[in-house]
Amino acid sequence: MNLSLKVLDKRGFLKQCTNLEELSTLMDREKIVFYVGVDATSASLHIGHLIPFMVMLHLQRQGHIPIILIGGGTTKIGDPSGKDSMRKILLKEDIDENVKTISSQLLKIIDLSNGGYILNNAEWLDGINYIEFLREVGIYFSVNRMLSFETYKRRLKDGLSFIEFNYQLLQSYDFYMLSRMKNCKLQIGGDDQWGNIVSGVDLVNRKSGNKVFGLTLPLITRSDGKKMGKSEKGAVYLDSELYSVYDFYQYFRNIPDLDVKKFLYLFTFLEEEEIERIASVKGQLLNNAKEILAFEITKIVHGKDEALKASSAAKAAFKGGDGRADIPFFKLELTNLEESILLVDLMVLAKVVSSKSEARRLIDSGGVYIDKVRVGDQNYCLCKDNFINGEIELKIGKKKILRIVL
Protein backbone atom coordinates (compact mmCIF):
# COMPACT_ATOMS: atom_id res chain seq x y z
CA MET A 1 0.00 0.00 0.00
CA ASN A 2 1.14 3.56 -0.74
CA LEU A 3 2.92 5.25 2.20
CA SER A 4 0.32 8.03 2.53
CA LEU A 5 -2.50 5.48 2.63
CA LYS A 6 -0.57 3.31 5.10
CA VAL A 7 -0.34 6.28 7.47
CA LEU A 8 -4.08 6.91 7.19
CA ASP A 9 -4.89 3.23 7.68
CA LYS A 10 -2.66 2.88 10.74
CA ARG A 11 -4.22 5.93 12.35
CA GLY A 12 -7.77 4.64 11.84
CA PHE A 13 -8.95 6.92 9.03
CA LEU A 14 -9.80 4.48 6.24
CA LYS A 15 -13.30 3.04 5.85
CA GLN A 16 -14.17 2.43 2.17
CA CYS A 17 -12.48 3.14 -1.16
CA THR A 18 -13.81 2.77 -4.68
CA ASN A 19 -10.57 1.02 -5.72
CA LEU A 20 -7.85 1.06 -3.07
CA GLU A 21 -5.30 -0.89 -5.11
CA GLU A 22 -5.48 1.41 -8.13
CA LEU A 23 -5.49 4.52 -5.94
CA SER A 24 -2.39 3.26 -4.14
CA THR A 25 -0.61 2.67 -7.46
CA LEU A 26 -1.54 6.17 -8.66
CA MET A 27 -0.27 7.79 -5.44
CA ASP A 28 3.00 5.87 -5.73
CA ARG A 29 3.40 7.28 -9.22
CA GLU A 30 2.44 10.92 -8.65
CA LYS A 31 1.31 13.56 -6.18
CA ILE A 32 -2.42 13.85 -6.67
CA VAL A 33 -4.96 16.64 -6.31
CA PHE A 34 -7.74 15.69 -3.87
CA TYR A 35 -10.67 17.45 -2.25
CA VAL A 36 -12.81 17.61 0.86
CA GLY A 37 -16.14 19.40 0.71
CA VAL A 38 -18.21 20.97 3.46
CA ASP A 39 -21.54 22.77 3.25
CA ALA A 40 -22.12 26.19 4.79
CA THR A 41 -25.10 25.21 6.95
CA SER A 42 -23.78 27.02 10.05
CA ALA A 43 -21.60 29.98 10.94
CA SER A 44 -19.00 27.58 12.32
CA LEU A 45 -17.74 24.07 11.84
CA HIS A 46 -17.59 21.79 14.89
CA ILE A 47 -15.15 19.05 15.85
CA GLY A 48 -17.25 16.45 14.07
CA HIS A 49 -16.03 18.10 10.84
CA LEU A 50 -12.35 17.77 11.77
CA ILE A 51 -11.65 14.18 10.67
CA PRO A 52 -11.58 14.77 6.87
CA PHE A 53 -9.47 17.87 7.38
CA MET A 54 -7.01 15.94 9.55
CA VAL A 55 -6.73 13.55 6.60
CA MET A 56 -6.18 16.56 4.36
CA LEU A 57 -3.29 17.69 6.57
CA HIS A 58 -1.72 14.22 6.53
CA LEU A 59 -1.89 14.00 2.73
CA GLN A 60 -0.63 17.56 2.35
CA ARG A 61 2.39 16.64 4.48
CA GLN A 62 3.11 13.85 1.99
CA GLY A 63 3.12 16.35 -0.89
CA HIS A 64 -0.40 15.85 -2.25
CA ILE A 65 -2.38 18.95 -3.26
CA PRO A 66 -5.59 19.80 -1.36
CA ILE A 67 -8.77 21.49 -2.47
CA ILE A 68 -11.11 22.80 0.21
CA LEU A 69 -14.56 23.02 -1.36
CA ILE A 70 -17.13 25.16 0.45
CA GLY A 71 -20.69 24.35 -0.58
CA GLY A 72 -22.10 27.80 -1.14
CA GLY A 73 -24.23 26.28 -3.90
CA THR A 74 -25.15 22.88 -2.47
CA THR A 75 -26.13 24.46 0.87
CA LYS A 76 -29.07 26.03 -0.95
CA ILE A 77 -30.38 22.47 -1.48
CA GLY A 78 -29.37 20.63 1.70
CA ASP A 79 -27.73 17.23 1.97
CA PRO A 80 -30.15 14.53 3.21
CA SER A 81 -27.26 12.24 4.29
CA GLY A 82 -27.56 11.31 7.95
CA LYS A 83 -30.71 13.41 8.41
CA ASP A 84 -34.17 12.21 9.41
CA SER A 85 -35.94 15.27 8.04
CA MET A 86 -35.40 18.02 5.52
CA ARG A 87 -32.87 20.68 6.48
CA LYS A 88 -34.10 24.22 6.95
CA ILE A 89 -33.69 26.27 3.77
CA LEU A 90 -31.26 29.12 4.52
CA LEU A 91 -31.34 32.62 3.08
CA LYS A 92 -28.68 33.36 0.45
CA GLU A 93 -27.26 36.17 2.62
CA ASP A 94 -26.81 33.77 5.56
CA ILE A 95 -25.14 31.17 3.35
CA ASP A 96 -22.73 33.76 1.94
CA GLU A 97 -21.78 34.87 5.44
CA ASN A 98 -21.30 31.26 6.55
CA VAL A 99 -19.03 30.65 3.55
CA LYS A 100 -16.81 33.53 4.69
CA THR A 101 -16.53 32.42 8.31
CA ILE A 102 -15.98 28.73 7.49
CA SER A 103 -13.34 29.64 4.91
CA SER A 104 -11.56 31.75 7.52
CA GLN A 105 -11.65 28.90 10.06
CA LEU A 106 -10.24 26.34 7.66
CA LEU A 107 -7.47 28.62 6.39
CA LYS A 108 -6.24 28.91 9.98
CA ILE A 109 -5.90 25.12 10.09
CA ILE A 110 -4.74 24.36 6.54
CA ASP A 111 -1.95 26.41 4.98
CA LEU A 112 -2.43 26.68 1.21
CA SER A 113 0.49 29.05 0.60
CA ASN A 114 2.63 26.26 -0.85
CA GLY A 115 -0.08 24.85 -3.10
CA GLY A 116 -3.75 24.06 -2.93
CA TYR A 117 -7.08 25.78 -3.43
CA ILE A 118 -10.15 26.93 -1.56
CA LEU A 119 -13.20 27.10 -3.82
CA ASN A 120 -16.94 27.75 -3.55
CA ASN A 121 -19.18 25.51 -5.66
CA ALA A 122 -21.61 28.40 -6.08
CA GLU A 123 -19.18 29.53 -8.79
CA TRP A 124 -20.47 26.82 -11.13
CA LEU A 125 -23.76 25.74 -9.54
CA ASP A 126 -25.53 29.10 -9.19
CA GLY A 127 -25.66 29.72 -12.93
CA ILE A 128 -26.78 26.26 -14.02
CA ASN A 129 -29.50 26.01 -16.66
CA TYR A 130 -31.78 23.26 -15.35
CA ILE A 131 -32.74 21.82 -18.75
CA GLU A 132 -29.12 21.68 -19.88
CA PHE A 133 -28.08 20.15 -16.55
CA LEU A 134 -30.62 17.34 -16.91
CA ARG A 135 -29.47 16.69 -20.48
CA GLU A 136 -25.74 16.84 -19.70
CA VAL A 137 -25.65 15.28 -16.21
CA GLY A 138 -29.01 13.71 -15.38
CA ILE A 139 -28.70 11.15 -18.15
CA TYR A 140 -25.88 9.44 -16.23
CA PHE A 141 -27.98 8.76 -13.13
CA SER A 142 -30.26 5.81 -12.49
CA VAL A 143 -33.11 6.51 -10.07
CA ASN A 144 -33.18 2.81 -9.19
CA ARG A 145 -29.52 2.94 -8.18
CA MET A 146 -29.93 6.20 -6.25
CA LEU A 147 -32.74 4.63 -4.24
CA SER A 148 -30.48 1.70 -3.36
CA PHE A 149 -28.22 3.96 -1.28
CA GLU A 150 -28.89 3.92 2.45
CA THR A 151 -29.47 7.69 2.68
CA TYR A 152 -32.42 7.60 0.30
CA LYS A 153 -33.76 4.22 1.45
CA ARG A 154 -34.05 5.46 5.03
CA ARG A 155 -35.56 8.82 4.12
CA LEU A 156 -38.17 7.35 1.78
CA LYS A 157 -39.98 5.98 4.83
CA ASP A 158 -40.26 9.43 6.44
CA GLY A 159 -40.49 11.58 3.34
CA LEU A 160 -37.83 12.77 0.91
CA SER A 161 -38.31 16.07 -0.88
CA PHE A 162 -37.49 16.42 -4.57
CA ILE A 163 -35.08 19.25 -3.80
CA GLU A 164 -33.03 16.92 -1.57
CA PHE A 165 -33.18 14.16 -4.17
CA ASN A 166 -31.22 16.47 -6.48
CA TYR A 167 -28.36 16.85 -4.00
CA GLN A 168 -26.46 13.76 -5.15
CA LEU A 169 -26.37 15.06 -8.72
CA LEU A 170 -24.95 18.40 -7.58
CA GLN A 171 -22.24 16.85 -5.40
CA SER A 172 -21.32 14.51 -8.24
CA TYR A 173 -21.13 17.49 -10.60
CA ASP A 174 -18.72 19.16 -8.15
CA PHE A 175 -16.31 16.25 -8.60
CA TYR A 176 -16.68 16.47 -12.38
CA MET A 177 -15.91 20.21 -12.34
CA LEU A 178 -12.90 19.81 -10.03
CA SER A 179 -11.61 17.00 -12.22
CA ARG A 180 -11.94 19.22 -15.28
CA MET A 181 -10.62 22.44 -13.70
CA LYS A 182 -7.89 21.17 -11.37
CA ASN A 183 -7.27 17.56 -12.49
CA CYS A 184 -8.66 16.40 -9.12
CA LYS A 185 -8.36 12.62 -8.73
CA LEU A 186 -9.78 11.90 -5.26
CA GLN A 187 -12.79 12.90 -3.17
CA ILE A 188 -12.67 12.30 0.59
CA GLY A 189 -15.65 12.39 2.97
CA GLY A 190 -17.41 10.75 5.88
CA ASP A 191 -18.83 7.27 5.38
CA ASP A 192 -22.36 8.72 5.32
CA GLN A 193 -21.28 10.31 2.01
CA TRP A 194 -20.51 6.98 0.32
CA GLY A 195 -23.47 7.09 -2.06
CA ASN A 196 -22.76 10.66 -3.14
CA ILE A 197 -19.04 9.95 -3.58
CA VAL A 198 -19.56 6.76 -5.61
CA SER A 199 -22.01 8.61 -7.84
CA GLY A 200 -19.46 11.37 -8.38
CA VAL A 201 -16.75 8.87 -9.31
CA ASP A 202 -19.13 7.23 -11.81
CA LEU A 203 -20.13 10.58 -13.34
CA VAL A 204 -16.51 11.66 -13.89
CA ASN A 205 -15.53 8.28 -15.32
CA ARG A 206 -18.49 8.13 -17.71
CA LYS A 207 -18.71 11.78 -18.76
CA SER A 208 -15.00 12.54 -19.21
CA GLY A 209 -13.30 9.15 -19.20
CA ASN A 210 -10.96 10.27 -16.41
CA LYS A 211 -10.12 7.71 -13.72
CA VAL A 212 -10.93 9.14 -10.29
CA PHE A 213 -11.44 7.69 -6.83
CA GLY A 214 -13.52 8.07 -3.69
CA LEU A 215 -12.41 7.46 -0.12
CA THR A 216 -14.60 7.50 2.98
CA LEU A 217 -13.69 7.84 6.63
CA PRO A 218 -15.37 6.27 9.66
CA LEU A 219 -17.90 8.30 11.60
CA ILE A 220 -16.18 8.81 14.95
CA THR A 221 -18.00 7.86 18.13
CA ARG A 222 -17.07 8.04 21.81
CA SER A 223 -16.85 4.97 24.00
CA ASP A 224 -19.37 6.46 26.45
CA GLY A 225 -22.02 6.64 23.74
CA LYS A 226 -22.04 10.44 23.58
CA LYS A 227 -22.12 11.99 20.13
CA MET A 228 -18.75 13.25 18.97
CA GLY A 229 -18.71 17.03 18.92
CA LYS A 230 -21.45 17.51 21.51
CA SER A 231 -21.00 18.71 25.09
CA GLU A 232 -23.20 19.97 27.91
CA LYS A 233 -22.92 23.41 26.28
CA GLY A 234 -23.99 22.12 22.87
CA ALA A 235 -21.84 21.71 19.78
CA VAL A 236 -18.07 21.99 20.23
CA TYR A 237 -17.53 24.69 17.63
CA LEU A 238 -14.19 25.63 16.08
CA ASP A 239 -15.10 29.32 16.37
CA SER A 240 -13.70 30.64 19.65
CA GLU A 241 -16.53 33.20 19.83
CA LEU A 242 -19.08 30.38 19.97
CA TYR A 243 -17.02 27.93 22.03
CA SER A 244 -14.05 29.23 23.99
CA VAL A 245 -10.55 27.89 23.39
CA TYR A 246 -10.43 26.88 27.06
CA ASP A 247 -13.64 24.84 26.76
CA PHE A 248 -12.36 23.32 23.50
CA TYR A 249 -9.19 22.23 25.31
CA GLN A 250 -11.22 20.89 28.24
CA TYR A 251 -13.48 18.86 25.95
CA PHE A 252 -10.51 16.78 24.82
CA ARG A 253 -8.89 16.84 28.26
CA ASN A 254 -11.98 15.15 29.69
CA ILE A 255 -12.62 12.40 27.14
CA PRO A 256 -13.16 8.85 28.45
CA ASP A 257 -10.01 6.83 29.17
CA LEU A 258 -10.96 4.27 26.52
CA ASP A 259 -10.80 6.93 23.78
CA VAL A 260 -7.37 8.37 24.56
CA LYS A 261 -5.24 6.24 22.24
CA LYS A 262 -7.77 6.38 19.38
CA PHE A 263 -8.03 10.17 19.60
CA LEU A 264 -4.25 10.61 19.81
CA TYR A 265 -4.01 8.78 16.48
CA LEU A 266 -6.88 10.76 14.93
CA PHE A 267 -6.35 14.27 16.26
CA THR A 268 -2.57 14.67 16.57
CA PHE A 269 0.53 14.23 14.43
CA LEU A 270 2.49 12.44 17.15
CA GLU A 271 4.46 9.44 15.95
CA GLU A 272 3.11 5.95 16.56
CA GLU A 273 5.84 5.05 19.07
CA GLU A 274 5.11 8.14 21.17
CA ILE A 275 1.36 7.54 21.13
CA GLU A 276 1.80 3.93 22.22
CA ARG A 277 4.14 5.05 25.01
CA ILE A 278 2.03 7.84 26.50
CA ALA A 279 -1.26 5.93 26.13
CA SER A 280 0.05 2.70 27.68
CA VAL A 281 -0.49 3.84 31.29
CA LYS A 282 -3.70 3.51 33.30
CA GLY A 283 -5.66 5.36 35.96
CA GLN A 284 -4.58 8.86 36.99
CA LEU A 285 -1.37 8.54 34.96
CA LEU A 286 -3.50 8.64 31.80
CA ASN A 287 -4.33 12.28 32.56
CA ASN A 288 -0.95 13.27 31.13
CA ALA A 289 -1.89 11.67 27.81
CA LYS A 290 -5.21 13.55 27.85
CA GLU A 291 -3.38 16.83 28.44
CA ILE A 292 -1.08 16.11 25.49
CA LEU A 293 -4.08 15.26 23.29
CA ALA A 294 -5.93 18.43 24.32
CA PHE A 295 -2.86 20.60 23.72
CA GLU A 296 -2.06 19.09 20.31
CA ILE A 297 -5.55 19.40 18.82
CA THR A 298 -6.04 22.88 20.30
CA LYS A 299 -2.73 23.88 18.70
CA ILE A 300 -3.92 22.60 15.31
CA VAL A 301 -7.25 24.42 15.45
CA HIS A 302 -6.44 27.60 17.40
CA GLY A 303 -2.65 27.94 17.20
CA LYS A 304 0.18 27.28 19.63
CA ASP A 305 -0.22 30.48 21.67
CA GLU A 306 -3.90 29.83 22.38
CA ALA A 307 -3.16 26.19 23.21
CA LEU A 308 -0.53 27.28 25.74
CA LYS A 309 -2.99 29.71 27.34
CA ALA A 310 -5.69 27.04 27.58
CA SER A 311 -3.26 24.54 29.08
CA SER A 312 -2.02 27.12 31.58
CA ALA A 313 -5.58 28.09 32.53
CA ALA A 314 -6.55 24.45 33.09
CA LYS A 315 -3.55 23.93 35.37
CA ALA A 316 -4.42 27.10 37.29
CA ALA A 317 -8.04 26.03 37.68
CA PHE A 318 -7.42 22.48 38.85
CA LYS A 319 -3.84 22.41 40.16
CA GLY A 320 -3.11 26.00 41.13
CA GLY A 321 -0.48 28.18 39.52
CA ASP A 322 -0.25 30.83 36.82
CA GLY A 323 -2.79 31.19 34.06
CA ARG A 324 -5.88 32.10 36.08
CA ALA A 325 -6.58 35.04 33.79
CA ASP A 326 -7.19 32.60 30.92
CA ILE A 327 -9.96 30.71 32.76
CA PRO A 328 -13.31 31.58 31.09
CA PHE A 329 -15.27 34.27 32.87
CA PHE A 330 -18.77 35.71 32.99
CA LYS A 331 -19.21 39.45 33.46
CA LEU A 332 -21.93 40.07 36.06
CA GLU A 333 -23.47 43.50 35.68
CA LEU A 334 -24.00 45.37 38.94
CA THR A 335 -27.62 45.93 37.95
CA ASN A 336 -28.11 42.16 38.22
CA LEU A 337 -26.45 42.03 41.62
CA GLU A 338 -28.24 44.95 43.33
CA GLU A 339 -28.17 43.97 47.03
CA SER A 340 -27.73 40.24 46.34
CA ILE A 341 -28.41 37.52 43.79
CA LEU A 342 -29.57 33.95 44.27
CA LEU A 343 -26.91 31.45 43.26
CA VAL A 344 -29.46 29.52 41.16
CA ASP A 345 -30.29 32.73 39.27
CA LEU A 346 -26.60 33.43 38.71
CA MET A 347 -26.01 29.92 37.37
CA VAL A 348 -28.79 30.38 34.81
CA LEU A 349 -27.59 33.89 33.93
CA ALA A 350 -24.03 32.63 33.38
CA LYS A 351 -25.41 29.74 31.25
CA VAL A 352 -23.67 27.01 33.23
CA VAL A 353 -27.11 25.38 33.55
CA SER A 354 -30.19 25.57 31.38
CA SER A 355 -32.74 26.04 34.16
CA LYS A 356 -33.20 26.86 37.84
CA SER A 357 -34.39 23.31 38.51
CA GLU A 358 -31.11 21.95 37.11
CA ALA A 359 -29.18 24.39 39.33
CA ARG A 360 -31.11 23.23 42.39
CA ARG A 361 -30.44 19.57 41.58
CA LEU A 362 -26.72 20.26 41.29
CA ILE A 363 -26.68 22.10 44.61
CA ASP A 364 -28.63 19.30 46.32
CA SER A 365 -26.18 16.72 44.97
CA GLY A 366 -23.21 18.64 46.38
CA GLY A 367 -21.77 19.53 42.99
CA VAL A 368 -21.58 23.33 43.29
CA TYR A 369 -18.67 25.25 44.82
CA ILE A 370 -18.02 28.94 45.41
CA ASP A 371 -14.31 29.71 45.86
CA LYS A 372 -13.67 26.00 46.53
CA VAL A 373 -16.35 25.82 49.28
CA ARG A 374 -19.29 23.49 48.64
CA VAL A 375 -22.71 25.15 48.63
CA GLY A 376 -25.54 23.07 50.09
CA ASP A 377 -28.35 25.62 50.28
CA GLN A 378 -30.65 26.18 47.30
CA ASN A 379 -31.40 29.67 48.64
CA TYR A 380 -27.74 30.67 48.90
CA CYS A 381 -27.26 34.33 47.95
CA LEU A 382 -24.22 36.28 46.83
CA CYS A 383 -23.56 39.95 47.53
CA LYS A 384 -20.73 42.35 46.66
CA ASP A 385 -18.76 41.32 49.74
CA ASN A 386 -18.36 37.81 48.29
CA PHE A 387 -16.48 39.20 45.30
CA ILE A 388 -13.01 39.54 46.78
CA ASN A 389 -10.82 41.41 44.28
CA GLY A 390 -13.89 41.75 42.10
CA GLU A 391 -14.51 38.09 41.29
CA ILE A 392 -15.50 34.67 42.57
CA GLU A 393 -14.81 31.17 41.27
CA LEU A 394 -17.85 29.04 40.44
CA LYS A 395 -17.15 25.34 40.08
CA ILE A 396 -19.68 22.78 38.84
CA GLY A 397 -18.71 19.17 39.50
CA LYS A 398 -15.09 18.20 38.98
CA LYS A 399 -14.46 19.66 35.55
CA LYS A 400 -16.37 22.90 34.95
CA ILE A 401 -14.95 26.18 36.31
CA LEU A 402 -16.06 29.73 35.58
CA ARG A 403 -14.84 33.04 36.98
CA ILE A 404 -17.69 35.43 37.82
CA VAL A 405 -16.32 38.95 37.44
CA LEU A 406 -17.87 42.27 38.43
Swiss-Prot record:
Superkingdom, taxonomy of origin: Bacteria
Keywords: Aminoacyl-tRNA synthetase, ATP-binding, Cytoplasm, Ligase, Nucleotide-binding, Protein biosynthesis, RNA-binding
NCBIfam families: tyrS
Top-level EC class as recorded in UniProt: ligase
EC number: 6.1.1.1
Gene3D superfamilies to which the protein is assigned, alphabetical: HUPs (3.40.50.620), RNA-binding S4 domain (3.10.290.10), Tyrosyl-Transfer RNA Synthetase (1.10.240.10)
Cellular component per GO, a single term: cytosol
Protein name: Tyrosine--tRNA ligase
Protein function: Catalyzes the attachment of tyrosine to tRNA(Tyr) in a two-step reaction: tyrosine is first activated by ATP to form Tyr-AMP and then transferred to the acceptor end of tRNA(Tyr).
CDD domains: S4 (cd00165), TyrRS_core (cd00805)
Subunit and interaction comment: Homodimer.
Catalysed conversion reaction: tRNA(Tyr) + L-tyrosine + ATP = L-tyrosyl-tRNA(Tyr) + AMP + diphosphate + H(+)
Motif ('HIGH' region): 40-49
Single biological process term from Gene Ontology: tyrosyl-tRNA aminoacylation
Cell compartment(s), UniProt: Cytoplasm
Location of the motif 'KMSKS' region: 227-231
Family per similarity comment: Belongs to the class-I aminoacyl-tRNA synthetase family. TyrS type 1 subfamily.
Span of domain S4 RNA-binding: 341-405
Disulfide bonds: none
PANTHER family the UniProt entry points to: TYROSINE--TRNA LIGASE, MITOCHONDRIAL, TYROSYL-TRNA SYNTHETASE
Binding-site residues for L-tyrosine, renumbered to this chain: 35, 167, 171
SMART domains linked to this entry: S4
Binding site for ATP: 230
